[in-house]
């Protein structure tokens, strides 16, 4: 747990997150309009999305299946009866004057996600509920001094709102929770998790309290769209509330926005209660009634999720806890790794992916899907290293060329005339020359200066342009130094 340092004492964070995850579907929740990102404004709008009189909603069954899959993935209980409600409020980008959501009878309740806390211990974050709702449109206020512009392309897109219990005790834990949830959604293929495209958005409820005291008044920070912003917003808001309370003030229950440039929260409006929205069942939509056979069928099709994959990597492949966590955290990286180890040593593959390949990717700011290196080519490289056909030094040079060109390691080695010297006789001759050229150093070595062994290795590597087999150098050099006539 991370405490907030006040002027007089320590305070605790109490945080709950509401995650709005866009359901991965080609069509919207109640209309057949496209959900493609980046289309021109108002080009993906049907009559229902614009709330034209007489238009009626027709439920997209696939979106319901995606929500069931997600609920199972977060260990939630599926409700066989769920009902859509109208959430009534006015906003310019909500043309109907209400949002179709699920308030009284959500599609799933309960559940949990496990994260690692600041001390590396497993912490279980409880889930309150998962419900389905439609997204609103988008308002733009910076294109004119006179008008605001409305884009309804997003209006009616299917969302899952996943609401946690207030079990999160620090901004770092909030970040870990979102990372784990996003990984689960991506493994399930129910949401792409792209926060930069608005496919995953977060509202954070935060209050502070003295240890073991009653809960304080919470504020809600709306529309956080990056993990970095979530952490910064929670840190600032926690400190702001502590400053108010320690100065004798009262925290107001309100909705806030976070200014990423200033690093501050500021009031948006007073926070509404459920009664303000006048929820009632939508008369145009029948209840969702689910058969157990459908739930069982979806459950049987679930993929291996991150936690199970981590356990398998540790228990079967014998990866370290850290390496297993990193490789399983991203679905695409995990798929790449598993393709590589079909034909290559798992431990060596993991080390080279996490150190050398990640280093190149991070430098260029690209993902594994944008990398030119295929899993088959990477596996070839690992096999060359395992068989000692090339040294680690040569392998790093080849890997960089693979990264830049996308070519296989064997083709690169042919084109660059890269070949490891593994002939013992050839290496022995080179070592003889090195020892003759450095007679005094050999004398010093034989008199106890063992550190000079590395010097001799370096001289051999220099003469061979780094292409000699290091293991053979060490073996032959030890023998030659013992036999050298002084």
UniProtKB/Swiss-Prot annotation:
Residues spanning the membrane: none
Pfam families, A to Z: GatB_N, GatB_Yqey
A biological process from GO: translation
Keyword hit for Magnesium: no
Keyword Nucleotide-binding: yes
PROSITE patterns (alphabetical): GATB
Entry's EC annotation: 6.3.5.-
Keywords: ATP-binding, Ligase, Nucleotide-binding, Protein biosynthesis
Catalytic function, reaction form: L-glutamyl-tRNA(Gln) + L-glutamine + ATP + H2O = L-glutaminyl-tRNA(Gln) + L-glutamate + ADP + phosphate + H(+); L-aspartyl-tRNA(Asn) + L-glutamine + ATP + H2O = L-asparaginyl-tRNA(Asn) + L-glutamate + ADP + phosphate + 2 H(+)
Record's subunit section: Heterotrimer of A, B and C subunits.
Function field: Allows the formation of correctly charged Asn-tRNA(Asn) or Gln-tRNA(Gln) through the transamidation of misacylated Asp-tRNA(Asn) or Glu-tRNA(Gln) in organisms which lack either or both of asparaginyl-tRNA or glutaminyl-tRNA synthetases. The reaction takes place in the presence of glutamine and ATP through an activated phospho-Asp-tRNA(Asn) or phospho-Glu-tRNA(Gln).
Entry protein name: Aspartyl/glutamyl-tRNA(Asn/Gln) amidotransferase subunit B
Species assigned in the record: Orientia tsutsugamushi (strain Ikeda)
Record lineage: Bacteria, Pseudomonadati, Pseudomonadota, Alphaproteobacteria, Rickettsiales
């Amino acid at each position: 747990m991370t405490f907030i340092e006040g002027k007089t004492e320590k305070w605790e964070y109490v945080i709950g997150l509401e995650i709005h995850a866009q359901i991965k579907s080609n069509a919207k929740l109640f209309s057949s309009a496209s959900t493609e990102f980046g289309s021109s404004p108002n080009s993906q709008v049907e009559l229902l999305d614009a709330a034209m009189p007489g238009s009626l909603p027709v439920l997209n069954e696939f979106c319901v299946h995606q929500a069931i899959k997600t609920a199972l993935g977060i260990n939630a209980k599926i409700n066989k009866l769920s009902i859509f409600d109208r959430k009534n409020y006015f906003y310019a980008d909500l043309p109907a004057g209400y949002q179709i959501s699920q308030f009284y009878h959500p599609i799933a309740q309960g559940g949990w996600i496990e994260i690692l806390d600041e001390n590396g211990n497993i912490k279980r974050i409880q889930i309150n509920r998962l419900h389905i709702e439609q997204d609103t449109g988008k308002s733009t206020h910076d294109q004119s001094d006179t008008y605001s512009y409305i884009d309804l392309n997003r209006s009616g897109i299917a969302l899952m709102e996943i609401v946690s219990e207030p079990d999160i005790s620090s901004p770092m834990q909030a970040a870990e929770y979102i990372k784990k949830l996003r990984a689960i959604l991506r493994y399930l293929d129910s949401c792409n998790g792209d926060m930069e495209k608005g496919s995953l958005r977060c509202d954070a409820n935060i209050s502070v309290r003295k240890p073991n005291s009653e809960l304080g008044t919470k504020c809600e920070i709306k529309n956080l769209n990056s993990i970095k912003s979530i952490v910064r917003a929670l840190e600032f808001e926690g400190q702001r509330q502590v400053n108010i309370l320690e100065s004798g003030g009262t925290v107001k229950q309100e909705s806030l926005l976070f200014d990423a440039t200033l690093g501050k929260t500021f009031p948006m409006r007073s926070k509404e209660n459920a009664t303000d929205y006048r929820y009632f069942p939508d008369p145009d939509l029948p209840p969702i009634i689910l058969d157990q056979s459908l739930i069982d069928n979806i459950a049987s099709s679930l993929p291996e999720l991150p936690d199970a994959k981590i356990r398998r990597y540790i228990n079967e492949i014998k990866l370290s806890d850290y390496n297993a966590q990193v490789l399983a955290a991203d679905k695409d990286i995990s798929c790449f790794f598993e393709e590589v180890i079909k034909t290559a040593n798992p431990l060596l593959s993991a080390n080279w992916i996490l150190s050398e390949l990640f280093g190149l990717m991070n430098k260029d700011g690209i993902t594994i899907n944008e990398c030119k290196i295929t899993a088959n080519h990477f596996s070839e490289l690992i096999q060359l290293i395992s068989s000692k056909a090339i040294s680690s030094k040569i392998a790093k040079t080849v890997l960089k060329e693979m990264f830049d060109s996308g070519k296989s390691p064997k083709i690169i080695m042919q084109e660059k005339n890269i070949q490891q010297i593994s002939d013992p006789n050839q290496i022995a001759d080179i070592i003889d020359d090195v020892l003759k050229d450095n007679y005094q150093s050999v004398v010093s070595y034989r008199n106890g200066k063992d550190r000079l062994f590395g010097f001799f290795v370096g001289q051999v590597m220099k003469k061979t342009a780094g292409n000699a087999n290091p293991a053979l150098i060490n073996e032959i050099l030890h023998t030659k130094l013992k036999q050298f006539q002084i």
